[in-house]
């Protein structure tokens, strides 16, 4: 991902920052939106105490954590709540689907024996898809975007620290820079992901889906936001 480019006006990082800090964090449209979705899920009176951009979420024993675009933590009448936010304009969910990532990881392992990427992909596929990474081929329903899988893994492990609920909103900002063709491709990648991971609809109005992993209830939604930059 070109982080410098994403901090440009109208791109994901810059737009996310504006959305959650204008006029200030507490009164921002971003916080209002997250509250709205938690309330729709029955978590009444949500209030937030912590927020951090580029928040590291370790999810396995290897060195590189999942870097969340924004993490927000708080309380509700039903208990603690957590949101791990992924921001997009029309940027891809990474450059690789799983079979591409795994093929490259195996090649890297030969060149760099200390590389752990092959092990990481194998463990993620086994844990969350219940298939071997080796078995995933081009065109398979499990051949999802690698970025989305480690977004899920990092968010679950973040919730395991203290909470048992995590909301994963993918916030798509339709700025002046938004490209519909690229946006449609991202939506297809998201739809493939929720199908492969067997998320089930739990709120039709907000298009929120749910699946429980261990003791963590995971909610996910694809939220499109018109934004004038």
Where are these regions (language model features)?
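Trp- and S/T/G-rich repeat-edge/linker motifs of beta-rich repeat architectures
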Residues: 1, 40-53, 191-193, 199-203
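Charged, often low-complexity linker/regulatory segments
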Residues: 1-33
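Short, charged/polar micro-motifs that form catalytic or ligand-binding hotspots
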Residues: 2-6, 57-61, 137-145, 183
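Active-site metal-binding core of divalent-cation-utilizing nuclease and nuclease-like domains
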Residues: 43-77, 91
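Beta-propeller domains
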Residues: 63-67, 140-144, 225-227
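Conserved catalytic cores of phosphodiester-cleaving nucleases, focusing on short active-site segments
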Residues: 70-72, 81-89, 151
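Catalytic cores of nucleic-acid endonucleases
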Residues: 88-171
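Non-catalytic C-terminal interaction segments of nucleic acid-processing enzymes
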Residues: 147-229
